[in-house]
Amino acid sequence: MTRSLFKGNFWSADILSTIGYDNIIQHLNNGRKNCKEFEDFLKERAAIEERYGKDLLNLSRKKPCGQSEINTLKRALEVFKQQVDNVAQCHIQLAQSLREEARKMEEFREKQKLQRKKTELIMDAIHKQKSLQFKKTMDAKKNYEQKCRDKDEAEQAVSRSANLVNPKQQEKLFVKLATSKTAVEDSDKAYMLHIGTLDKVREEWQSEHIKACEAFEAQECERINFFRNALWLHVNQLSQQCVTSDEMYEQVRKSLEMCSIQRDIEYFVNQRKTGQIPPAPIMYENFYSSQKNAVPAGKATGPNLARRGPLPIPKSSPDDPNYSLVDDYSLLYQ
């Protein structure tokens, strides 16, 4: 299969036509526009990643999430909050990487723009030169053709005046014929000179057109390769972000595997237990039964109190100087 090349497929039979060159330039402009669109896409994606990372960071650091949990589940939640924080930081770092890739794309576009500008200036100049020389050549051709017609008319006039008796008129016709022949020769030389110049300009234009096609084709190959690699790198970055996030979430899963329902229950019981004996039942008390069983004031009352016997009377011991009888007690000081 023959390789399709720019230099072999963008010509026109019309010497003044630039349709082939214009099609190439339009394609290159579209390619540059596509690179700019991808560059803008990267910038927008970077803004989204940064905004998401910051929002996730604020959520992780400011929003309570099981803050009153205890023991093993508490530790798992701490790992979870930390890994969410790490994931948020990864998204912010991804945003920075995307902006860096967008900057590289912008630099690449500007580099190709400058390279193209040099070639375009040369081609614009040669196109103008070709058009101007073609116009001069066509004007010379018209002048040459007119001089030829003038000479033919002069020859016909001389032929018609062969029978004229007036020699002065014949002489004028011969002078006009000679002048027209000279004019034809001069215009023919000028026309041929312009044709030669136009051919040189045409050859120069063809040479520059081939160079431009080769330069533009190489530039387009470079652009496609750069764009392809940039897109490949972009999806690799997104895939790596997913892998990194999954690795961080795996740490959360591992911490959840260490959770023990039994230990958390026992921990709570040991930390907050209040006792092991429940309250006794509340018994029914009949109001009227309580009145019948009431005792005079000053005497102990209470449910199921055992009755006591009479208090013992102390024996008198007059011989004991520290012992006093009740009869000897008086409130009056004597």
Curated annotation (Swiss-Prot):
SUPFAM superfamilies: BAR/IMD domain-like (SSF103657). Its main location: cytoplasm. InterPro entries: AH/BAR_dom_sf, F_BAR, FCH_dom, PSTPIP2_F-BAR. Residues 4-264 form the F-BAR domain. It is found in: Cytoplasm; Membrane. It is a peripheral membrane protein. CDD domains: F-BAR_PSTPIP2. Phosphorylated on tyrosine. One of its GO terms (cellular component) is membrane. Keywords: Coiled coil, Cytoplasm, Membrane, Phosphoprotein. Pfam families: FCH. Residues 295-322 are annotated as: Disordered. This is Proline-serine-threonine phosphatase-interacting protein 2. The gene is PSTPIP2.
